[in-house]
Amino acid sequence: MRDFIQHLQDRGILENFSSGLDNVSTPVSAYLGFDPTAPSLHIGHWIGICFLRRMAHFGLTPVALVGSATGMIGDPSGKSIERTLLEESQVAYNSQKLSECLAYYLPGVQIVNNIDWLKETTVIDFLRDVGKHFRLGVMLGKDTVKQRVQSEEGISYTEFSYMLLQSYDFAYLFENYGVCLQCGGSDQWGNITSGIDYIRRHGLGQAYGLTYPLLTNSQGKKIGKTESGTIWLDPKLTSPYELYQYFLRLPDQEVPKVARTLTLLSNEEIFDLDQKFLLDPVAVKKFVAETLVTSIHGEDGLREAQVVTQSIHPGKVSSVSEKDFQDLVAMGQAVSLEGTQALGKRWIDLFVALGVCSSKGEARRLIEQKGLYVNSEPIENEHSVFEETQVCFDQYVLLAQGKKKKLVLRLI
């Protein structure tokens, strides 16, 4: 354990750990939980996935827990208001999708689900066997609970009970799977230490906890959230291109932290990047973005991201091959129209009809700002029409709104 902890400290991604953990010399099994609040993992979960991979690299036995049972309750940690409770069928669906995702990213890692042991537990048994080991004074003193109790929103008994369920999970894994270490983000420290105390009070043995810092920007907001929503790992929800662009647009000062937290580059490679970053932050940012997209979506995902990126830059359409257009169509970045329905029509009307712009007013404003593109060339004015000379490879036209919205118009 000492080498693992030293690695995390050197990398700057260790927040807290239990006293004595660094002296444990016997093989350690450790777990990290994922609640199924959505049908996909998001970029914040990638921290946990990388953490589990690091554990395996240093000889620990990682276990991933899907929290179907706890997902029915909702973790109050880091939340200022209560989560909306999900239907049981939705939790079951989300759990299945998360299990598939974890199995893909963590081949060989054991995946367990707490519904398997909590579904048979009665309320009476839970209160007698688990509840009696917890003291309200201690629970109310936990930061997450304290903040919610003092807030206008308050905290429901449902959320208040989450700590007990997570503690029971830890004890169950300790007793049945030999798991003595629970890991998680820094906002989980209170829940983790409650589990350690419960295991001790129950006379099961010595357990430990370890947390890593949450990935936040300079304003303290979690990285992975945008104005348009969450950055998902599922390519159907967040395309490789969108993921790539998200990291390319990160403020320069966030890049070293992202490289340390979200990549599996060695510490030596990270330290080397730090030096290169001082000389050329843009090049390092591009490298980190490419590394992350490849790790999450593979080489094909990176190529997809690069193809779309190349195709939407002004003046670059001449370098887009017919195969690139075909790839864009295959990626779902296309709409088909009969040539007679499109040729000769005003572009301002087509951009609205195709959903690239929400209204003609928006389209006019963007045209004035040189923000609407046909084949990477800005539309000159609102009277510009679709001409046959703009068709590439007899059937394709590349449309874009700025650098974000892009669409291939395919003539049939």
Curated annotation (Swiss-Prot):
A motif ('KMSKS' region) lies at residues 222-226. One of its GO terms (biological process) is tyrosyl-tRNA aminoacylation. Residues 345-412 form the S4 RNA-binding domain. ATP binds at residue 225. Its main location: cytoplasm. SMART domains: S4. It is an enzyme of class 6 (ligase). Keywords: Aminoacyl-tRNA synthetase, ATP-binding, Cytoplasm, Ligase, Nucleotide-binding, Protein biosynthesis, RNA-binding. It comes from the Bacteria. One of its GO terms (molecular function) is tyrosine-tRNA ligase activity. L-tyrosine binds at residues 31, 162, 166. Homodimer. Belongs to the class-I aminoacyl-tRNA synthetase family. TyrS type 1 subfamily. Catalyzes the attachment of tyrosine to tRNA(Tyr) in a two-step reaction: tyrosine is first activated by ATP to form Tyr-AMP and then transferred to the acceptor end of tRNA(Tyr). This is Tyrosine--tRNA ligase.
